[in-house]
């Protein structure tokens, strides 16, 4: 397979849905005996991710022989267009020297029939030494070409099919593709004709199509079986907004705050850990968490040894969250917000809070997402007259009680850059989305201001006047509808704050931190 790359794009598309209608008459496979666990994998190549995700699916076949007595696996995957597969998988492989032109030509012929096709299958553990061709079986093709897997009915239908085909005591749902974190301008009502979402990004046509927090929750909640674990193998998804939105539909969340390598999580480790720790799910998930981040560090070290200069910026992480304790954290965080809002009326307090906001740890260069723990901790320490030591300790403990495990790459740990979870910050209800240059992140190409009332101003570097438009919704119709905001009233601070937060991420600016 071609060497792993970082991907966290934000473009998508519209297709025909993969539902139980005329376009998808396929019946479930003959159900197997009930297992302890069933892994339900749901993904899309996202133009640039086919190589990595195909390897992930191959890894499902590499578990220990005995593991499959305890763990069953069902999968649905949509391939990118053959043009994207050629450009981002085959041509890049030739350019990087990881495959020959002859091999690329051979793979092109093999993969061309999978152009924008969706496959659905159950992993057969009797297949030894599985290779790419096991995923190119035309019998696996499901539904019409170019179907929309970002449709809520498609995901619900897949879960219902998979849980019938692979009955188990416990279910783990994996959603794999590009991720965009939480952004209000993506969080439009999923009932609307032009649906837009922030997970499972498609890249073929316009208008854009992908899951939002609300549409993903809706799809999962309508399924016949409850998911014990939801794992989003996608960038930027470990934010408090998504955690609260999904807390009532699953017991555990596996999410990453920063970017996720194209290689994805260690799926073989997931299969084996679930089998070896069948009676202790938290142990299994924690071990999987550790194995995945260690794999990413190992990949980065190998790439650095091969001369890849960017490999030293190996900023990856994974967190397993225990959702049953989020309500208790939300109660404490509401008190934090109540006092923050009241304290801001005092000029001395305001100056201290503004200084903290100005230097808040930004997770991603583009998005308005910041380290929730670092931000809250800095404020409680700076304002002992507002937050006594006992409250600060209670707030921290309530958050820690939600953590099953958390691992960060060596680069993040060695430079003290780890982040527990992100949260959105805004200025008087308006938030900023930046466009930093991909090749040189110190160059700002422009930025957008999304106003609470739906107005949008787009500023392009070098131009004097902004382009004024709308973003098709408002903060009251998006952020204020989130479970997190209803529990904590965080939007009160988004409206009240007058200080622009830090504009770039110390992790993504590629400055020589600590060197």
Ranges and model annotations:
Residues 3-13:
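Bacterial N-terminal signal peptides
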Residues 11-35:
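Bacterial Sec-dependent N-terminal signal peptides
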Residues 35-38, 67-73, 166-172, 224-229, ...:
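Loop/turn elements at helix/coil->beta-strand transitions in domains of secreted/extracellular proteins
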Residues 41-46, 76-80, 175-179, 232-236, ...:
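Active-site-proximal beta-strand/loop segments in catalytic clefts of secreted hydrolases
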Residues 48-53, 82-86, 181-185, 237-242, ...:
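Extracytoplasmic/secreted cell-surface and envelope-processing proteins
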Residues 49-82, 89, 93:
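N-terminal carbohydrate-binding/catalytic regions of secreted carbohydrate-active enzymes
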Residues 81, 92-93, 98-135, 139, ...:
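Catalytic-core segments of thiol-dependent peptidases
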Residues 160, 164, 188-515:
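Terminal, contiguous helix-loop blocks that mediate binding/assembly
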């Amino acid at each position: 397979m071609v060497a792993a790359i970082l991907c966290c794009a934000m473009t998508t598309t519209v297709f025909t849905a993969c539902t139980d209608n005329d376009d998808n008459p396929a019946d479930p496979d003959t159900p197997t005996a009930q297992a302890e666990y069933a892994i339900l994998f749901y993904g899309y190549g996202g133009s640039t991710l086919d190589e990595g995700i195909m390897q992930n699916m191959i890894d499902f076949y590499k578990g220990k022989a005995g593991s499959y007595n305890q763990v069953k696996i069902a999968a649905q995957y949509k391939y990118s267009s053959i043009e994207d597969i050629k450009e981002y998988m085959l041509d890049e492989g030739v350019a990087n020297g990881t495959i020959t032109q002859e091999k690329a030509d051979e793979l092109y012929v093999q993969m061309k029939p999978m152009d924008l096709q969706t496959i659905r299958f159950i992993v057969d553990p009797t297949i030894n030494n599985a290779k790419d061709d096991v995923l190119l079986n035309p019998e696996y093709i499901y539904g019409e070409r170019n179907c929309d897997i970002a449709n809520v009915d498609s995901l619900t239908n897949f879960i219902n099919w998979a849980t019938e085909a692979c009955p188990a005591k416990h279910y783990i749902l994996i959603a794999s593709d590009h991720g965009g974190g939480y952004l209000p301008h993506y969080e439009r009502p999923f009932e609307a004709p032009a649906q837009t979402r922030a997970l499972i990004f498609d890249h073929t046509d316009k208008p854009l199509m992908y899951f939002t927090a609300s549409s993903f929750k809706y799809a999962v909640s309508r399924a016949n079986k409850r998911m014990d674990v939801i794992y989003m193998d996608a960038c930027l998804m470990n934010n408090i907004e998504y955690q609260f939105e999904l807390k009532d539909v699953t017991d555990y969340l596996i999410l990453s705050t920063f970017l996720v390598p194209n290689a994805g999580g260690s799926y073989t480790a997931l299969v084996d850990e679930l089998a070896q720790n069948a009676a202790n799910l938290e142990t299994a998930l924690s071990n999987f968490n550790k194995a995945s981040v260690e794999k990413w560090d190992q990949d980065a070290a190998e790439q650095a040894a091969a001369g890849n200069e960017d490999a030293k910026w190996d900023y990856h992480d994974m967190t397993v969250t225990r959702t049953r304790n989020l309500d208790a954290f939300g109660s404490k965080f509401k008190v934090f917000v109540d006092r923050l809002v009241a304290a801001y009326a005092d000029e001395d307090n305001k100056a201290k809070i503004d200084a903290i906001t100005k230097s808040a740890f930004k997770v991603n260069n583009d998005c308005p997402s910041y380290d929730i723990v670092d931000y809250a901790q800095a404020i409680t320490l700076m304002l002992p007259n507002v937050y006594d030591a006992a409250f600060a300790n209670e707030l921290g403990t309530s958050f820690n009680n939600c953590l099953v495990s958390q691992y960060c790459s060596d680069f993040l740990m060695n430079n003290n850059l780890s982040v527990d979870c992100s949260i959105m910050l805004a200025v008087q209800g308006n938030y900023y989305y930046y466009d930093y240059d991909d090749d040189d992140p110190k160059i700002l190409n422009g930025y957008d201001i999304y106003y609470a009332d739906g107005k949008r101003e787009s500023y392009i570097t070098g131009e004097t006047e902004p382009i004024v438009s709308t973003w098709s919704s408002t903060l009251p119709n998006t952020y204020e509808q989130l479970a997190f905001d209803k529990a904590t009233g965080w939007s009160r601070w988004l409206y009240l704050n007058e200080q622009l937060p830090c504009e770039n991420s110390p992790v993504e600016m590629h400055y020589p931190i600590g060197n």
